[in-house]
C-alpha cells in the first residue's frame, strides 16, 4: 500500500511527542555509534542507551511549548557496561567519557505536521540538518577537542503511532510510539580527535514507555543515584538548550580532572 500523506493539527502531534494534559511522558532508546573515516573500515565504538522526559504546555494561540531533559550513556560495545574512560584507537590516549546530560531540550510546536498514513499506523518523518557556529572553536583551549568553525550534523527521525489513537479526540496521548533515529555528526569533543577527518554514525531506535519504572534498569539506577533531576521534565520552559558541546564547555575543568560523568544534579 502506498502511504497517504495527511496534515495533522498541532494537538495531534503533541499526543505523539508528549501529552495534551500537561503530564510528563518518557521515551527510551538503544543503539550503536560507528566511526566513518575516509579510507578506513568502520569501527563500532559504542553502544548507547538513553531516555527523555518531556512535557508540553498549551499557549493561548493554540501553539505548544515543549520542554524536556535527556540522557544518553556510552556503553562498551562488548560488555554493555557504562564507559567512564575510553582508549582512543587512533591516538592511543585514554580520555574521560562525557555522557549526554542535556537539560533542557526545548521546542515550540504550531501549525500542521505531515504524517504518512498507512492503514493502522502513521509515521512522522523529520530530516533535520543543524548547522551553526561551533562555540568551542573560538577558544584556544579547545583546539585539540573541537576546532571546526562550524557544527554540522544530520538528525533523521521517524516516529510511528497507531492511527486510531492519533485521531481519537478522547485520548490525550498515544499508548504506543516507536522511534527510529539515525544521525551523522562530528567527533564528540571529549574524544579529543582534533582535526582528524571523519564522522560518527548513530543508529538507534526506541519507544514511549508508561513511566519511570519502565526505563532500562541501568538508567533508573543512574538517575536515582546520580542525576535525580532527570526523573521529571521541567514544569515550564527554561533557558537556552543544553547540547553535548555546551555541556562539555561548562564542565571542561571536571573533564580535565577525570571526574565521573554525568556531573551529579539534584532533583528540583
For each feature predicted by the language model, list its residue ranges.
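Intrinsic disorder/low-complexity segments enriched in polar/charged and small flexible residues
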Residues: 15, 31, 66, 88, ...
Amino acid at each position: 500500500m502506498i502511504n497517504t500523506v495527511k496534515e495533522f493539527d498541532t494537538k495531534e502531534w503533541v499526543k505523539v511527542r508528549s501529552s495534551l494534559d500537561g503530564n510528563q511522558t518518557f521515551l527510551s532508546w538503544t543503539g550503536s555509534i560507528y566511526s566513518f573515516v575516509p579510507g578506513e573500515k568502520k569501527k563500532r565504538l559504542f553502544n548507547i542507551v538513553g531516555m527523555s522526559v518531556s512535557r508540553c504546555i498549551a499557549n493561548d494561540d493554540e501553539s505548544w511549548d515543549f520542554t524536556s531533559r535527556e540522557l544518553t550513556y556510552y556503553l562498551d560495545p562488548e560488555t554493555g557496561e557504562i564507559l567512564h574512560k575510553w582508549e582512543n584507537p587512533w591516538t592511543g590516549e585514554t580520555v574521560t567519557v562525557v555522557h549526554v546530560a542535556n537539560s533542557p531540550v526545548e521546542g515550540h510546536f504550531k501549525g500542521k505536521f505531515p504524517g504518512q498514513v498507512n492503514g493502522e499506523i502513521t509515521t512522522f518523518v523529520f530530516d533535520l540538518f543543524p548547522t551553526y557556529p561551533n562555540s568551542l572553536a573560538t577558544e584556544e583551549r579547545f583546539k585539540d577537542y573541537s576546532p571546526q568553525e562550524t557544527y554540522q550534523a544530520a538528525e533523521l527521525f521517524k516516529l510511528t503511532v497507531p492511527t486510531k489513537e492519533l485521531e481519537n479526540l478522547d485520548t490525550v496521548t498515544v499508548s504506543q510510539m516507536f522511534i527510529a533515529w539515525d544521525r551523522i555528526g562530528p567527533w564528540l569533543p571529549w574524544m579529543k580527535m582534533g582535526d582528524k577527518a571523519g564522522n560518527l554514525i548513530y543508529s538507534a531506535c526506541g519507544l514511549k514507555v508508561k513511566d519511570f519504572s519502565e526505563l532500562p534498569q541501568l538508567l533508573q539506577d543512574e538517575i536515582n543515584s546520580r542525576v535525580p533531576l532527570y526523573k521529571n521534565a521541567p514544569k515550564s520552559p527554561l533557558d537556552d538548550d543544553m547540547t553535548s558541546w555546551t555541556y562539555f564547555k561548562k564542565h571542561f575543568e571536571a573533564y580535565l580532572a577525570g571526574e565521573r560523568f554525568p556531573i551529579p544534579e539534584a532533583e528540583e
